[in-house]
Every structure is written in C-alpha cells, then in structure tokens.
C-alpha cells in the first residue's frame, strides 16, 4: 500500500521511507485493484494491506470499507507507531477488517524495540494486540528470528500461546 513508515527496523525489506511515494496507487487505483481481487472468487482471497505502514495512508478506512463492500476479506499489517490506536482499530473493525498482523520480535521492550529501532514500539504492539482481542479481530504474530532474539523464543512463546485468536509465524 505504501513504502512510508516511521520505524527503523534492522531487517526491513520494504525499503521504507518516511513519507509516501508519489507513485503509490491513488484511492481510485486501489479500489480498482480491490475490484480485480473480488473477481478472483468466490470466495475472493484475503487481501493483506501492508507496507511500509498502511496507517500512513489517509484512505485506509475507506479502502477497508470498499473491500468489505465487495466481499473481499481484509487484513492489515501496521507498524506500531502512535498512528495505531485503539480507536483506529475499532474504526477499521467497523469498516470490515477481519485480521491484524503484528510483529513481535522480543518478549520485552529491550529486545523488541532494539529490533525495531524506536523506543516504545513493544508497548504499542501489545496495546494493539489487546485492542484486537477486545474487538475479536484475528491476529497473526510475525517474528523475524535472528541472532538478536533467537535466545528469546521460549519467552515469546509464553506471550503468544495463551491466545486462541492468534497465529504465530516465525
């Protein structure tokens, strides 16, 4: 959806940049893409809105609602920045969001935030996860395993396993 992102993740493969690229799809172009995805059904495949950080798109809620109106299930993979709030998650759920993909690269702020390059990301991730539970949104936890966090996987498992709404990808 966008390459724009406010994090500085050590492993980023999206070549994230602080602001949106002018060549990104416009709202109308994104809606046309959703129309094409809708034709791939029935049922249409899950559309995962990712980036960068999809929260950097001001039309995110509009696009989720548009997809829901076309019976295209939507998940999104946000960055845990101040843009990702409980209110925004509630708004996206009301628009039709089915699933949320969060990155958890450590069992504590020291490990996770070092991986993400910005302090406070772990706490925002946990808050987003809690909001998703509250609104009964399925959550996929993604973990990039490296030498920085391999030793921490057992502790991360204790965080992830208790939730029936979660899939964990490592």
Residue ranges and their predicted role:
Residues 2-99:
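Conserved alpha-helical substructure of the radical SAM core
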Residues 7, 74, 109-110, 139:
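Glycine-centered loop/turn positions within well-structured domains
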Residues 17, 107, 144:
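Conserved sequence/active-site signature of Rossmann-fold short-chain dehydrogenase/reductase
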Residues 25, 58, 120, 148-151:
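Residue-level signal for the nucleotide or nucleotide-sugar donor/cofactor binding architecture
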Residues 40-49, 70-77, 98-101, 123-170:
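Conserved C-terminal portion of the radical SAM core fold
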Residues 54-55, 80-84, 98-119, 147-148:
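Conserved radical SAM core fold
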Residues 87-90, 112-115, 152-155:
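Short secondary-structure transition/capping segments
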Residues 91-95, 118-120, 158-160:
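Short, hinge-like loop/turn segments at secondary-structure boundaries
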């Amino acid at each position: 959806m966008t390459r724009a992102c406010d994090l500085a993740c050590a492993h980023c493969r999206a070549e994230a940049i602080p602001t949106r690229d002018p060549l990104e799809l416009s709202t109308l172009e994104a809606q046309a893409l959703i129309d094409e995805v809708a034709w791939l059904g029935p049922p249409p495949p899950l559309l995962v809105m990712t980036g960068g950080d999809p929260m950097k798109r001001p039309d995110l809620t509009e696009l989720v609602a548009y997809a829901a109106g076309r019976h295209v299930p939507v998940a999104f993979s946000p960055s845990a920045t101040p843009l990702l709030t409980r209110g925004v998650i509630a708004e996206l759920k009301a628009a039709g969001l089915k699933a949320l993909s969060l990155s958890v690269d450590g069992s504590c702020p020291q490990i996770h935030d070092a991986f993400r390059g910005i302090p406070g990301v772990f706490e925002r991730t946990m808050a987003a996860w809690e909001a998703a539970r509250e609104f009964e949104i399925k959550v996929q936890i993604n973990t990039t395993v490296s030498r920085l966090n391999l030793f921490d996987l057992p502790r991360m498992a204790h965080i992830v396993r208790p939730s029936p709404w979660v899939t964990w990808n490592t």
